[in-house]
C-alpha cells in the first residue's frame, strides 16, 4: 500500500505496513522491544532467525524513532530499520522516501555474510592445503556423495593452482546422513588423516575424480582395499590406516566435524567459511577473488 504524508516541509512516501501496537502506550523505554516484536510477528522470517537490537535514534519523521535491527539467518546478517512512534503505539515497516531519497536504504546499509568465530572451527584438527598464514582461509564442509560438493571442489582446485600462496583450504567432513554409504566413506577417508595430511589428499582427490565417483557406492571392503592400494602406491603407511580404522579414529573425526558444522549452522553441503564469513552453497570463484583483492 502506498501512503503519502506531508509533515511540514518534509514529504514522505511509505511503501510499508502501518501498524497500531496495542498495549504499548507510554512505554518509551521499550521502543526497541516493540520493533523486535513487530518484525517477528509481521515479516515472515525464516525459522531460526535471530533478531538483534543495534540502536535507536531520531527519525526523519517527526515523533518517530528509527530503530536499527540485525536479522541473523543461517548464512546472512540482514540489517533492517523499523520506524516506531515515541508513544510506542504506531510502527512502520518498509521503505521511507524523503524528498525523493530512499532514507531507509541509506540507514540500513548492506546485507553481509554471517560471521563465524574461527576458533569454533578447530581447523588445526583438519586436513588442509596451502600456507598456514594465507591471505584467504576457506573452511568447507563437504562429502563425497554430493554432486554439488564435487563441482565446488573442481572450482576450488583450479583456484588453489592459480593462487597457491594466497589460499589456505581446510576440509571438513559433513555427510548428510547419520549412517549409510556417505557416512561410511567419510569415516574411511577421515581415517587416512592419521597417516598424514598428504595421504588424506591423495585419497580425497581420488574419490572426487571421475573414476572415484564410480566407486563411492561400493561395499565397505572394496573401498577399504582401494584406499590401501592408493596409500601403498604413494608410499604411505598402510598399517597406520588400518590402525585408524580399528580404533575408529575416522569415525571420531567425522563426528567432530559434523558437530562443529551443526553448531555454526551448516544444514546442507557444500557450505563454507571464508575469512570468518559463512557461505552456503558452491563457493563462487568471483566471491573468493574479492577476498583476494583481485
Descriptions of predicted regions:
Residues 142, 148-163:
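Typically the conserved alpha-helix immediately C-terminal to a functionally engaged Cys/Sec
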Residues 2-7, 21-115, 294:
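N-terminal targeting signals for export/organelle localization
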Residues 108-126, 144, 148:
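Acidic/His-rich structured neighborhood in mature extracellular/periplasmic domains
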Residues 131-147, 169-173:
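Short active-site neighborhood of thiol/selenol oxidoreductases, capturing the structured segment around
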Residues 9-20:
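Bacterial N-terminal signal peptides
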Residues 118-136, 161:
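A short beta-strand-turn-helix
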Residues 26-37, 42, 68, 78, ...:
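Cysteine-centric redox/oxidoreductase cores and disulfide-bonded domains
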Residues 137, 144-151, 190, 205, ...:
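C-type cytochrome heme c attachment motif
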Amino acid at each position: 500500500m502506498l501512503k503519502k504524508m506531508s509533515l511540514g516541509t518534509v514529504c514522505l512516501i511509505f511503501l510499508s505496513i502501518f501498524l497500531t501496537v496495542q498495549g504499548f502506550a507510554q512505554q518509551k523505554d521499550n521502543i526497541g522491544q516493540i520493533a523486535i516484536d513487530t518484525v517477528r510477528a509481521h515479516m515472515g522470517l525464516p525459522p531460526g532467525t535471530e533478531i538483534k537490537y543495534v540502536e535507536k535514534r531520531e527519525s526523519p519523521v517527526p515523533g518517530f524513532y528509527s530503530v536499527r535491527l540485525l536479522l541473523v539467518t543461517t548464512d546472512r546478517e540482514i540489517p533492517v530499520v523499523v520506524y516506531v512512534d515515541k508513544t510506542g503505539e504506531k510502527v512502520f515497516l518498509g521503505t521511507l522516501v524523503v524528498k525523493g531519497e530512499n532514507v531507509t536504504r541509506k540507514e540500513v546499509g548492506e546485507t553481509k555474510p554471517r560471521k563465524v568465530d574461527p576458533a569454533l572451527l578447530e581447523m588445526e584438527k583438519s586436513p588442509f592445503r596451502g600456507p598456514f598464514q594465507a591471505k584467504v582461509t576457506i573452511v568447507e564442509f563437504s562429502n563425497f556423495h554430493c554432486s554439488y560438493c564435487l563441482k565446488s571442489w573442481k572450482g576450488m582446485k583450479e583456484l588453489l593452482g592459480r593462487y597457491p600462496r594466497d589460499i589456505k583450504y581446510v576440509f571438513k567432513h559433513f555427510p548428510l546422513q547419520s549412517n549409510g554409504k556417505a557416512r561410511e566413506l567419510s569415516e574411511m577417508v577421515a581415517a587416512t588423516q592419521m597417516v598424514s595430511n598428504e595421504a588424506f589428499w591423495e585419497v580425497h582427490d581420488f574419490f572426487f575424480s571421475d573414476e572415484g565417483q564410480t566407486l563411492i557406492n561400493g561395499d565397505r571392503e572394496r573401498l577399504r582395499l582401494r584406499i590401501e592400494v592408493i596409500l601403498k602406491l604413494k608410499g604411505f603407511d598402510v598399517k597406520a590406516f588400518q590402525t585408524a580404522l580399528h580404533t575408529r579414529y575416522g569415525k571420531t573425526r567425522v563426528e567432530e566435524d559434523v558437530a562443529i558444522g551443526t553448531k555454526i549452522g551448516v544444514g546442507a553441503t557444500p557450505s563454507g567459511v571464508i575469512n570468518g564469513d559463512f557461505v552456503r552453497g558452491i563457493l563462487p570463484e568471483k566471491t573468493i577473488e574479492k577476498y583476494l583483492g583481485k
